[in-house]
Amino acid sequence: MKKISIHDLMKWKQEGKKFATVTAYDASFAQLFEQQEVPVLLVGDSLGMVLQGKSDTLPVTTEEIAYHTRCVRAGSPNSLLMADMPFMSYATPEQACENAGKLMQAGANMVKIEGGEWIAETVRVLAERAVPVCAHLGLTPQSVNIFGGFRIQGRDEAKAEQMVKDALTLEAAGAQIILLECVPASLAERITKACTVPVIGIGAGNVTDGQILVMHDMFGISANYMPKFSKNFLAETGDMRKAVTKYIQDVEQGVFPVAEHTFN
């Protein structure tokens, strides 16, 4: 696989070519994903739940994300590698710069930040300092205590309008990717069409430019439960490499996710 950059993703959006993304946490799986040509990987703070057994992502630290970023980069030198900025690691633009620097030095090509237009200044400051940003909207797991659990977001018109505004504000501030989690497919379509940057979805229908799954969900090995928006590709194929290839093909062909994985 050739080295993937944000310019490739922008080109694919313009061409209408969909792309697959998956989380990764170690060198071995990162290598497998690169060999199967997954173009974008995310070292997610989901590691707190799927690796550490925590009930949410809040305890994860910047140092832990940096460690796993180094591991993933060692296994996948050519993917576009995003790294999550953990809870309270970007409370101020200054703090965000310090912690984003650690993740970029660990091998990330981009950092992912959760939040709406209130993080626009942080996005702007990072972008001005050569740190590309993916802005995460919708169900932002670090806000689980505000939401009262892991719940679909943007169902009423006022919140939907605010999310569209958030996406456009963050793009204007310099965000190079928008990630939408657990939002109605109709809202995801509005945002995908409104934004000029690539939009990645999870639980957001099949109209976004890209899709992302947690690798443990994709392989059906999550300890607790299978989210509505996920699919066990390993059960369908019986082989990890074939499962990854099937996931990529289904995303590119627009046949994953289908209605059963989508919120209305």
Curated annotation (Swiss-Prot):
**What NCBIfam families does UniProt report for this protein, alphabetically?**
panB, PRK00311.1
Q: Which reaction does it catalyse?
A: 3-methyl-2-oxobutanoate + (6R)-5,10-methylene-5,6,7,8-tetrahydrofolate + H2O = 2-dehydropantoate + (6S)-5,6,7,8-tetrahydrofolate
Q: How does it assemble?
A: Homodecamer; pentamer of dimers.
Cofactor note from UniProt? Binds 1 Mg(2+) ion per subunit.
InterPro entries per the record? Pantoate_hydroxy_MeTrfase, Pyrv/PenolPyrv_kinase-like_dom, Pyrv_kinase-like_dom_sf
Q: What family, per the record?
A: Belongs to the PanB family.
This protein is called 3-methyl-2-oxobutanoate hydroxymethyltransferase 1
Residues that bind 3-methyl-2-oxobutanoate: 45-46, 84, 112
- Needs which cofactor? Mg(2+)
Q: Which Gene3D superfamilies match?
A: Phosphoenolpyruvate-binding domains (3.20.20.60)
From what organism does this protein derive? Aliivibrio fischeri (strain ATCC 700601 / ES114) (Vibrio fischeri)
The keyword Cell inner membrane is annotated on this UniProt entry: no
UniProt xrefs under HAMAP family: PanB
Q: Where does Mg(2+) bind?
A: 45, 84, 114
What's the top EC group for this one? transferase
Q: Which domain of life is it from?
A: Bacteria
From the Swiss-Prot or TrEMBL record, state where the protein is found. Cytoplasm
Indicate whether Metal-binding appears among the record's keywords: yes
> Which keywords annotate this record?
Cytoplasm, Magnesium, Metal-binding, Pantothenate biosynthesis, Transferase
Q: Which GO terms describe its molecular function?
A: 3-methyl-2-oxobutanoate hydroxymethyltransferase activity; magnesium ion binding
Its EC number is 2.1.2.11
